[in-house]
Amino acid sequence: MAAIGWPGIVAIISVAISFIIMAADWVGPDITFTILLSWLTAFDGKIITVAKAAAGYGNTGLLTVIFLYWVAEGVTQTGGLELVMNYVLGRSRSVHWALVRSMFPVMVLSAFLNNTPCVTFMIPILMSWARRCGVPPKKLLIPLSYAAVLGGTCTSIGTSTNLVIVGMQDTRYNKQNKEDEAKFGMFDIAPYGVPYALMGFVFIILTQRFLLPGNSSRYAKDLLIAVRVLPSSPVVKKKLKDSGLRTQTGFSLAGLWRGGAMTRQVDPDTVLEANDILYCAGELDVVEFVGEEFGLGLVTAETERALTDGQAVGDSEATAFHDTGASPYKKLVQVTMTKTADLVGRTVREVSWQGRFGLIPVAIQRGNGREDGRLNDVVLAAGDVLILDTTPHFDEARDDFKINFEKLRFVKDGAAKEFVIGVKVKKNSEVVNKTVTAAGLRGVPGLFVLSVDRADGSSVDASDYLYKIQPGDTLWLAADVGAVGFLSKFPGLELVQQEQVDKTGTSILYRHLVQAAVSHKGPLVGKTVRDVRFRTLYNAAIVAVHREGVRVPLKVQDIVLQGGDVLLISCHTKWAEEHRMDKAFVLVQAVPDSSPPKRGRMAIGVLLVVGMVLTQIVGGLKEKEYIHLWPAAVLTAALMLLTGCMNADQARKAIMWDVYLTIAAAFGVSAALENTGVAGKVANAIISIGKSIGGDGPALIAIYVATAVMSELLTNNAAGAIMYPIAAIAGDQLKIPAVDISVAIMLGASAGFINPFSYQTNLMVYAAGNYSVREFATIGAPFQIWLMVVASFILCYMKQWKQVWIATWSITAFIVFVPALLTLLPHTVQNRMEAFFDRIAEAINPRAALQRRRSARAQSFGGKAMSVGSTESRTDGSSTPDVALTFIEMPKMGVR
């Protein structure tokens, strides 16, 4: 092949610069590829002509991707997927079975629906389910993304990349009049994708103990936090060993204060009493979860000081794990004491925290091994990490704050708009005869149960963790807008204001929620919702009201509106546009994903999707395409529109135009690389690998690895589109079937597991689970290596796919069910195996092992030393001081 001329050099340099821009995340791939393609057309057709550059925008594979978003939106709007998944998930108490129950259904679902919608609706379902089952949500969210990706490798419609490759293969070989080579059936990838997915699933199951993060967070670890056992807590009158507190992951009980006496080593047979003070060693978010689950309230330094001074302290003067509405304090923050802080050397008691900073100490992480007593007696030192509650006077921009503190992080933000919203329990609701926790309504991000109004007129406080919900009960909840969307889709519940909503006459098909801020000079100020006759005047119903700094406890109709109040309104989809300039409001905006589910259309939506899939299955079995997936998707979506599964606006918004632009432009860029001979040169390198080793396998492995690496740096769609012409040239020269080439690229393009920004579903769970990049890489890097080995084996033995299927299914079945068989062994054998796996875990992940040792030491020997200052060896050979545990010694009087 001749040397690459100047057009090829320009193309290489241009693509390289674009890769750097996208890898650094300076500009998104949709904009970058579009500009790159336009630039490559500016050389009088020497690199690529305008006509060829524009051809990608009409590619049938790309059009299929776009219109499948309509189908996914239609079935999601009916609420059918949530109902099915809640039923399939069931209940589990172990991480092993939780992963099995959550990953398998998602893998099956994502084989036929786009990954992004699957993960979007599964995140809140999975988080609620995890809380309900007592499993750390962080153990499940990364596997959720991986399961969606793995499931997508099982069919040609499983991912947008698969459809793109199918479209490119069809276009390439039809132009060459090779119709047999152009065909790629719906299940042509299944013989290789299913074993690939199963082995990925097996890896997650085997390594979840060692590599998956638990309830760890990005914030300070090994804090010692004091909590009070609330009178209605389910642990009252239970022995410690029977309470469930000792079995919580990442949570250790290090001491107990009762009746003026401190117990450093708590006997497992100790019976817990109301108002006991428990000293919990762990991370703030772990203690928060356990506190909400078991009915525990947080104790602050201010509470301790008041008690020490002999003052009576009410509940409103302490901080709860969730804003209770009684306290004006809205956020918990984490800060580090600076070296130049004038607070260094002073005790916590000596600092006027509220007056000077608008802050109240909650916990301190120590690292120097000094003996400290009560929280107020701790002598502050540079480098101390503090968890602080904020007051309305807190201002991070003040010079005084900057001098004393650095590394500010908002650990818990309660200042987001929070609405009080009421929901009624329907007669046949699944939550009937369940506690709030068992119903999945406690521990949901942005949602907090305030109280329950019973059907007989009596009221139950939210702190009653034992109350079982009954038909006709009204649950009053504090919820941000995201949680309101979750509530609107929760089966068996309906809004208290539902009657008012129905009276507006707006069809459920065009109903959604809007936020509208009341103008300070508008006509609504000073009037109740009832006096205004809001529904009659605006043809909309107020569902809830948010008032800055104050939780509004009144029923909506009786609230006297004030300027600045934010109204949550159920209305027609065009209401926001019609009232955007209304003098009564200063800000009107729609709440995303707030349309109520059209459950009456659920069966229709599911049947239409099944019908669409069946057209492709039958066509594949008959080796005759009855209808292409693109028009099949459009017709399915059209029927969904006609039957009321979704409306036209929802269909328009469902299309991800950034994906469309990225794929379309990447088609043109790949064509430019082929026209200039660059693709051929790279293909020659792959051909050389194949010829030097021998056989098709090495060449296919090289294609897979190159695509996988590119997928980590770019998007999966871009990686597939860029690599296809290169791989196709190599395949043609090596006489490798076109289907095999496409399979290698499809598998490689989906292999974006290390970088949370490499795949859209990764990014979604990264944000929802509050992961760090390191946590993602800890599981992602070995997972990537494992799948490269698996893919290499599969690609080398493609002709023996039946034997590979039998082997992988057998391995999967063994891994899934062996834990159930192990429970039949004697307890002594089980304990030895547990210890053996613990040693393996320590060898693989020393950081996690260190955290477990600290927790165990705090739980078993917490009373023998108030501060622990020993050092632990780090993996890099250095040492780091262990964290001192600072106990809050409580005086003999009433406690919070």
UniProtKB/Swiss-Prot annotation:
It comes from the Eukaryota. It is found in: Cell membrane. GO terms for biological process: potassium ion transport. The keyword Chaperone does not apply. Its main location: membrane. Keywords: Cell membrane, Membrane, Repeat, Stress response, Sulfate transport, Symport, Transmembrane, Transmembrane helix, Transport. The keyword Transmembrane applies. Pfam families: CitMHS (PF03600), TrkA_C (PF02080). Induction: Down-regulated by sulfur deprivation. Residues 857-881 are annotated as: Disordered. Residues 868-881 have a biased composition (Polar residues). GO terms for cellular component: plasma membrane. The chain crosses the membrane at residues 1-21, 47-69, 106-126, 140-160, 186-206, 602-622, 626-646, 654-674, 685-705, 734-754, 776-796, 804-824. Residues 212-296, 319-404, 408-493, 499-586 form the RCK C-terminal domain. GO terms for molecular function: monoatomic cation transmembrane transporter activity; symporter activity. It is a multi-pass membrane protein. Belongs to the divalent anion:Na+ symporter (DASS) superfamily. Na+/sulfate symporter (TC 2.A.47.4) family. Na(+)/sulfate cotransporter with a probable low-affinity for sulfate. This is Probable sodium/sulfate cotransporter 3. It comes from Chlamydomonas reinhardtii. The gene is SLT3.
